[in-house]
Amino acid sequence: MKYLAAYLLASLSGNANAASVTKILQSVGVEVDAARVESVCKELDGKDVQALIAAGKSKVGSVAAAAAPAAATSAAPAAAAAAPAKKVVEEKKEESDDDMGMGLFD
């Protein structure tokens, strides 16, 4: 993701190449993987950045919509399993040693 963000910043300046992406990443203290920078630049070279962003938004929206119902169904059994645990946790109160017939100040 950071490589993509650096590429997008470099493309805004009109200088989207591996050297620019590397310089951007190093400026914020990222340890740069040169092979990954080359791969990102090669994959995105010549593509419209706005079209890539629009395609990414549509993919993220479809994944989020599909994942939401799955999370809701898995939460119900977990809540049902947690309810019996509360009944078992009840502790017995220890009897106090206060009234054993040995009062010091009777």
Swiss-Prot record:
One of its GO terms (cellular component) is cytosolic large ribosomal subunit. GO terms for biological process: cytoplasmic translational elongation. Residues 80-106 are annotated as: Disordered. The keyword Acetylation does not apply. Phosphorylated. GO terms for molecular function: structural constituent of ribosome. The keyword Phosphoprotein applies. InterPro entries: P1/P2_N_sf, Ribosomal_P1/P2, Ribosomal_P2. Disulfide bonds: none annotated. Keywords: Phosphoprotein, Ribonucleoprotein, Ribosomal protein. P1 and P2 exist as dimers at the large ribosomal subunit. Belongs to the eukaryotic ribosomal protein P1/P2 family. Plays an important role in the elongation step of protein synthesis. This is Large ribosomal subunit protein P2.
